[in-house]
Amino acid sequence: MNCEVCQLKELEVESFEIREVLRCILHTIVFHRALGLIRPKDIDLELFEITYVQCGEIEVEKKIDEKIEQFINWIEKHPNKKSQICLSFYEVKSKQPSWFTKIERLYWEQWYINLNVLQPTKPPVGKSHHSKLVMDPGEASEERSSRRTLLEQSLQEVLFQIIKFVNEKKDHVPPINDGVIYYPFEITIPSSSDSAFGMDMFKRILHSGHPSMLG
């Protein structure tokens, strides 16, 4: 099976922005791959002038929120690092050897969310009047507002990137089964070892076939 891969534009975020940004992106992806009778729910972001749509499925919301909390906990232990989250859609296939039934996941689409988590700037230690690094509150507030505006624009670009990918890449999407509301998916976050995360992704690609890339 061919596995399509989409690398989303990297976003620079502060730790307090992670939750909203990831909810927006993950729910948007799942919504655009949803099937059957869903109950769309508009969500207005609190930090940005952006509205996105959820499927309205409690199980989906719970699954996404749990992974976001795990990712935030990982970020707290690994500051100043660029991070990647992978949302993978898959089909479940049953293999039936003579003694037992083996369940295999065939990945047909993977989304990579790339974040650069910024650490809040701290004023320099000391009272030297020669220091030019001290920023007055007004200037700091203006810089934060400017950065927030840029992040909002970048987040909108990511949402457009998702919609473009979904509209252009359809041939690899599996047939719809009766009664299915959304395709099975999993969310992978970095582990305590970056190499383990990379090896896990490599194994999935091997099981799914050679992926096609769209930046």
Swiss-Prot record:
Matching Pfam families: ATG101
Where is the protein situated, by its record's location annotation? Cytoplasmic vesicle, Autophagosome
Location of region: Disordered:
124-147
Metal-binding is among the record's keywords: no
Q: What does the UniProt record say this protein does?
A: Accessory protein involved in autophagy. Acts as a scaffold protein of the ATG1-ATG13 complex for faithful delivery of autophagic vesicles to the vacuole. Required for selective mitophagy.
What family is reported? Answer: Belongs to the ATG101 family.
This protein is called Autophagy-related protein 101
Q: What species is given as this protein's source?
A: Arabidopsis thaliana
Q: What is the lineage of its organism?
A: Eukaryota, Viridiplantae, Streptophyta, Embryophyta, Tracheophyta
Q: Which gene encodes it?
A: ATG101
